[in-house]
């Protein structure tokens, strides 16, 4: 094998060609992938517990997705929907309108990234309400664009050095029993926000991840989501549910919002929507979504025909392969193994998450007030050395999140958990 094909050589070329601001988890370079496995340019195999940050619920290179993309490529790759539209965009919109929770008629807008979806959700909320304020949550993540960063409740690395950010964005604490933040605490903070920062009649929307992603996989309870829905209705505020990471069966429901039995006014979607192709969506109540004037929404690549074809195939796979049920089974498998590890390792402070959106919080001596970010970083590195791709998250940088493809076999998941145990032993020294 020539030197140019080695990970080390590619790393040197990366450092010479790519900006420093794009971080990299592992210094390996992938040549091919299949379902829940990766192989780098040196032929080393990895079990993928990251799924490209929750993008591959249907796995790498699912045959049905590949076939759909190939068929569309043979027809055409791009026209721009705003110039000469095409059926795939409409067919996918119809399916999402039917899938998103609630009886109210829906409309869908397609874009390319999750951050774009969030930006446009805020635009639509402002257009519908005539208001400008937005309330978000500490620990929330909504993208790296300027409004996305303003809404995001985590500074390092996303917001460092990039301000000032758009105004009239206010943050509430996110409820977490583990961190000692009660739902009553959050509701009291909202009351204080209304009295000290912005009156409710100026708030266009409250945006929430039903399960925080980058923030640490903290789930909002059904009772809290219901109360938030009631408060939004009381004050004429739109409720935006950001399901970019939690959507498309990751939690054991098609959307995590379903656990609360509520209907959001707007939902943002991306990541696993299109099986690895860049596609995002804003889906919401028709009367809300139609507030923007023609020409105010869209984008050159928004709703790419290739990505729409992939997404239509993804929706078929979800149904045919029963991914909600498989997410529940995978989550139970992972949590059972983590509970066994927690009996042996006092660094495991909490195990949580619905379905296969599972997190393990690392602390010192089971003390929630003593997060262990250093151990978390070492664990990710040791896992990578052993052929397991793991992601960390959390405002305190001490949470391991599990995002294996939902199509991964139980045997492969077990193999990955064996590697996790080995890595944890090594990381602890």
Predicted regions, residues:
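Conserved N-terminal phosphate-binding loop of PLP-dependent enzymes in the Aspartate aminotransferase
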Residues: 1-429
